[in-house]
Amino acid sequence: LLKVRDVADFGCGPGWYTYLLYKQGYKVNGYDGNPHVKEMSSLLFNDGFYCQYADFTLPISVKEPFELILCLEVGEHIPQIYEDVFIQNLVNNSKKYILLSWAIPNQKGWGHVNCHTNEYVIERMRKYGYHYNLSTSAILRKAASLFWFKDTIMFFERH
């Protein structure tokens, strides 16, 4: 779908998606809110690859923005009071694309404190200059193997 060279995964967990992209030759960085993510990912992959800690409730600035920010099922874990900072972290560190999923109301899961409808998230991203790409989102939703992504994957492009 896209020809990007560099990707950041915000909320990468132990780094599975990040590592897969790394092995495919992408320049990729993974960031997670778990303060032990570096040790966890270093042990898991055991080849020098690791992810980094980031507190998404505080402003984050990377050296150079990434072409694509991947952020899957993270926003619902961020208290609403920090939602603006969280979204700003996505848009400020992206050159062009954001692939985002955000748990919808009543979606099962642990630690969900800030679920939103797709429409709400699309409008929030629009205010930051990101356009919802319906056709790319539909392709990704159809291809998703995890059922919740079929309702929550949203692909955004900077205007």
Map each language-model feature to its residues.
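Active-site catalytic microenvironments for nucleophilic, acid-base chemistry
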Residues: Q24
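Conserved class I S-adenosyl-L-methionine
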Residues: R5-G13
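Conserved SAM-binding motif I beta-strand of class I
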Residues: K27-D32
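S-adenosyl-L-methionine-dependent methyltransferase catalytic module, highlighting the catalytic core
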Residues: C12-W16, L20, G33-S61, F66-C71, ...
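Glycine-rich helix-loop-beta junction characteristic of Rossmann-like nucleotide cofactor-binding loops
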Residues: L1-K3
